[in-house]
Regions:
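Catalytic-core regions of core metabolic enzymes
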Residues: 1-266
């Protein structure tokens, strides 16, 4: 199950927050502040005391308890940061937008393994790393644009590619498509597309849940899980439009270099 602290946090910390909205840490904070989020927002940057009007802490250790962290710092600093958040700050929701993990080299893959091990120990959930983020009707935890006005009757969009998320949102918004949630899972180090489908299935409410799901996949960690929950959602009246990339040799190389995906014939 996906932790409630990721889905509906009462407090969010942006680690690596910036006043420069051209940087991920700046655009994340801007999008979060402009979203529907009603909880507490904290920022961390060792060089700042205030970022975009929000009090800034110089160290993660100085933060109060926080439900969810959106992390935009160099990969090498992420394992220790996650460790502090998970074990000292009670954090269970994590979005890591930083690159430099399993998609890059073995050292990055080791960082990823350490992070997942830590988050699993506290029963938390991770989107990413190497992603553009996550947004639902509770808050926007993404650094890309455009950010759609979310609609409970819109589609749930799940993608392994942040660039594809941007393209689909841009094209969809100009053609009348609305969104209920957008999950850009990146490397899928812990939460993958099949886990999002499981969440959409097990929390499905015929009165309030979206009936349309769009999926762009670069890898499938657990094909049987994906099929099980896809079938269940379809039986509940949902429609699913899915594309699996990486079928050709060129596509496989692109997926591997992009998110570390090992494309197969699935």
């Amino acid at each position: 199950m996906i932790a409630k602290e990721l889905l509906n946090p009462k407090s969010i910390a942006v680690i690596g927050a910036s006043g420069d909205t051209q940087k991920p840490g700046g655009s994340i904070l801007r999008n979060l502040l402009n979203s529907n989020f009603k909880g507490e927002v904290y920022t961390v940057n060792p060089k700042e005391t205030e970022v975009q009007g929000v009090k800034c802490y110089q160290k993660v250790e100085d933060l109060p308890q926080v439900d969810c962290a959106i992390i935009a710092i160099a990969a090498k600093f992420c394992p220790a940061t996650v460790n502090t958040l998970a074990f000292e700050k009670g954090t269970k929701g994590f979005i890591i937008v930083s690159a430099g993990f399993s998609e890059e080299n073995e050292q990055g893959a080791e960082f990823e393994r350490q992070i997942v091990e830590t988050i699993n120990k506290v029963g938390g959930s991770l989107i990413g790393p190497n992603c553009t983020g996550f947004l639902n009707r509770n808050y926007c935890g993404a650094f890309d644009s455009p950010i759609p006005t979310l609609d409970p009757h819109g589609v749930d969009f799940v993608t392994g590619s942040g660039a594809t998320a941007v393209f689909i949102k841009e094209y969809g918004m100009t053609n009348g498509l609305t969104f209920n949630s957008v999950w850009a899972v990146g490397n899928s180090a812990q939460v993958g597309i099949e886990d999002v489908l499981e969440h959409l299935d097990t929390t499905f409410d015929p009165e309030t849940s979206s009936r349309v799901i769009m999926i762009y996949m670069e890898k499938i960690g657990n094909p049987q899980k994906l099929l099980k929950h896809s079938r269940s959602l379809i039986n509940k009246g949902c429609r699913i439009a899915a594309i699996k990339s990486g079928g050709s040799a060129a596509g496989s190389r692109a997926a591997s270099s992009h998110t570390g995906a090992l494309a197969t014939d699935d």
